[in-house]
């Protein structure tokens, strides 16, 4: 017999608790290895409680992605707006890399859930990045926004996977790379 006292939560608190627990489980085991039952067991609740909020683990993953992406944009948007009309700006790119590198869960979520989910999430990410960058871009380089976005995301993911300790050195190298590329136009 379970003697644990359950705590009643407001719906938004319960929803957020589900997202937090699911994120931790996805990070530990990988998205494909986590079920609604696993999340419920970790929370000591019954599965139907989770189904009140989310119809599937894919829906949970999408909600987590939205939250993480919003957090990233809230950190990135002021940097872009303060850069004025000098985007692409090498310093801005290295700052965006630092922010992305500090969001390992976002990077993991971008790469899990199968090809169709990855494509959908990358499309969301790139659409938002283009919307943020294009008003400030006076570049004659075609596709500059997705190039910068993929460079930042890919390098941040690689640095985490390879356990690169000196991210400042990597950010500076990225800044030099972008600066060199812009000087050659």
Predicted stretch roles:
Residues 61-68, 118-121:
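Alpha-helical DNA-contacting segments of helix-turn-helix folds
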Residues 95, 99, 139-181:
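Hydrophobic alpha-helical segments that form the core
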Residues 43-54:
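Short hydrophobic/aromatic patch on the recognition helix
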Residues 1-29, 33-45, 59:
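Basic, helix-initiating cap at the start of DNA-binding domains
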Residues 73, 114-146, 169-172:
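Amphipathic alpha-helical packing segments from all-alpha helical-bundle domains
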Residues 63, 74-102, 148, 171:
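Hydrophobic alpha-helical connector segments
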Residues 17, 21-28, 71, 75-82, ...:
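Solvent-exposed, amphipathic alpha-helical segments
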Residues 88-126, 157-161:
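Amphipathic alpha-helical segments used for helix-helix packing
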């Amino acid at each position: 017999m379970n003697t644990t006292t359950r705590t009643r939560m407001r719906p938004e608190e319960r929803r957020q608790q589900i997202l937090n627990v699911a994120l931790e489980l996805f990070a530990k085991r990988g998205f494909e290895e986590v079920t609604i039952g696993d999340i419920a067991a970790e929370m000591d609740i019954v599965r139907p409680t989770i189904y009140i909020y989310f119809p599937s683990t894919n829906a949970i993953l999408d909600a987590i992605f939205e939250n993480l992406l919003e957090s990233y944009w809230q950190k990135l948007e002021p940097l872009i707006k303060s850069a004025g009309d000098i985007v692409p700006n090498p310093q801005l790119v290295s700052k965006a890399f630092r922010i992305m590198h500090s969001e390992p869960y976002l990077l993991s979520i971008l790469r899990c859930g199968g090809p169709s989910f990855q494509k959908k999430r990358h499309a969301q990410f790139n659409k938002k990045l283009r919307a943020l960058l294009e008003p400030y871009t006076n570049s004659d380089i075609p596709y500059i926004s997705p190039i910068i976005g993929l460079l930042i995301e890919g390098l941040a993911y690689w640095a985490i996977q390879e356990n690169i300790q000196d991210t400042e050195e990597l950010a500076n190298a990225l800044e030099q790379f972008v600066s060199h590329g812009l000087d050659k136009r």
